[in-house]
């Protein structure tokens, strides 16, 4: 049994008004959706519920209008892309509460889909205001949360509603929760975590939580430089948070105490300037020239990481190993991603990855579809990895 209430627990939805929180915060240009990935991910759940004969009422935010009606943050331009993904007409209401919403909901027939205007047009959304949550709940009989990416926020449409109506996880939310549970809550061991990206400062909580939970932790990207510096190695002109040397030392000590093996780069690809195809050399990490900066992990480091992955049953990945957006400094990220993908396809590894740069890096390597699960959630994925309770998820926990 799942630890969370899902659509499988909801019974018949025929004739019910189903308020479904979705993530439609998609990139737009000149009033058109330029990347419909988020829409395509929630479309199957919307279709499933509509085909059961429910009246599907979609709630979403867009941008950061901060409680004011900003025309540039209207959800109306999303309607054509939503209709195209669903293969059906989608109605639109000019507000998410009040008469405009109530009238649009009253006009729905079984199987219809309605998108309500941006919840963040109301200050009560981000304050999780009780009266605003009541006003949203007035238009529904059942609540479905299909927006894991917003689950770390205790807002009226992500958390408040779940206490006012029978509440269930949608299919995409369910898949995300199942994947994260497999990744960290009850994983097959040994577990290896790969954490990259530029700064230690943004991932202190993450690193401290992971050393207590995983068997091996690979630290890569710019943040590895701070750890190398803490170990007394000169990193030249590399990005390095020297003021966090003490924090890095503390994390290394915590890992040793917890029996977590830390894997840092042993060699690096260094260049004197940060640009595509800049002249570069591969050097040991204790021989980085003063005028150079580390822009990627070297081949010996990649071999060590891949050997560690071979000895693991579960991989959790957040952040690239180098400046992957500039060739040839994408080599370590691409080689490691391809190796992890091959192990996953062979049934040897459960691989869970997430965070904006990570998704882009895996897609750049051409293996995004080969991982067990790739989360598009960003902040919510990070907070889960940090061991924090997510309000939108906690509200869906099965009682008993």
Curated annotation (Swiss-Prot):
GO terms for molecular function: ADP binding; ATP binding; phosphoglycerate kinase activity. It catalyses: (2R)-3-phosphoglycerate + ATP = (2R)-3-phospho-glyceroyl phosphate + ADP. ATP binds at residues 203, 325, 355-358. Keywords: ATP-binding, Cytoplasm, Glycolysis, Kinase, Nucleotide-binding, Transferase. Monomer. Substrate binds at residues 23-25, 38, 61-64, 120, 153. This is Phosphoglycerate kinase. Pathway: Carbohydrate degradation; glycolysis; pyruvate from D-glyceraldehyde 3-phosphate: step 2/5. The keyword S-adenosyl-L-methionine does not apply. It is found in: Cytoplasm. Its EC number is 2.7.2.3. GO terms for cellular component: cytosol. InterPro entries: Phosphoglycerate_kinase, Phosphoglycerate_kinase_CS, Phosphoglycerate_kinase_N, Phosphoglycerate_kinase_sf. GO terms for biological process: gluconeogenesis; glycolytic process. SUPFAM superfamilies: Phosphoglycerate kinase. HAMAP family: Phosphoglyc_kinase. Belongs to the phosphoglycerate kinase family.
